Amino acid sequence: VNKKSSNQKKELIEFYRGMLLIRRFEEKAGQLYGMGLIGGFCHLYIGQEAVVVGLEAAAKEGDKRITSYRDHGHMLACGMDPNGVMAELTGRSGGYSKGKGGSMHMFSKEKNFYGGHGIVGAQVPLGAGLAFADKYRENNCVTFTYFGDGAANQGQVYETFNMAALWLSLIHISEPTRPGI
């Protein structure tokens, strides 16, 4: 077996493990939500695991991420501890937002994860702000801004597209939200 083929196989197995972690985590979160152990809303990322795992494979250290309220899978894909994510979902102080953010408002500056946001499309211009900060700092980082297809009709989304096309290192990812509903 040549080394390149062996490394590729290992990489594919890691992708699969990442997707499986997200799927199993979300299934458990859905179960806990149904039992009333997760307060508020709980928007699952089931059916979209490959999107974030693939993009995280292309991310480099220092790159930033921002997403909507369907954020658990993103946190897991960027290497955050599943126990910390679950603690946040269940309102415990060991969560990434000290149990105050719940399902939709998690955050970790250490992992360059700038949150899930509850307002449809609001994260898109916020992602542009993160990208502008990187441009001013001249640090060659990229911001990954995820949004659901429901945000695609929001004015600020298209305004941000125009800004990004002209000036920013910003990748917009439109995810179909139907699989998670």
What are these regions (language model features)?
Residues 172, 178-181:
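Single conserved hydrophobic/aromatic residue that forms the stacking wall/gate
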Residues 19, 86-89, 173:
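A generic structural signal for nonpolar/aromatic side chains embedded in well-ordered alpha-helices
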Residues 27-30, 35-167:
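Cofactor-binding active-site loop characterized by glycine-rich and histidine/acidic residues
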Residues 1-39, 61:
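Cofactor-/ligand-binding subdomain signature composed of acidic, glycine-rich
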Residues 143, 171-174:
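Short beta-strand segments at enzyme active-site cores
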Residues 23, 70, 175-177:
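Short, cationic motifs built from Arg/Lys/His that form the positively charged side of catalytic pockets
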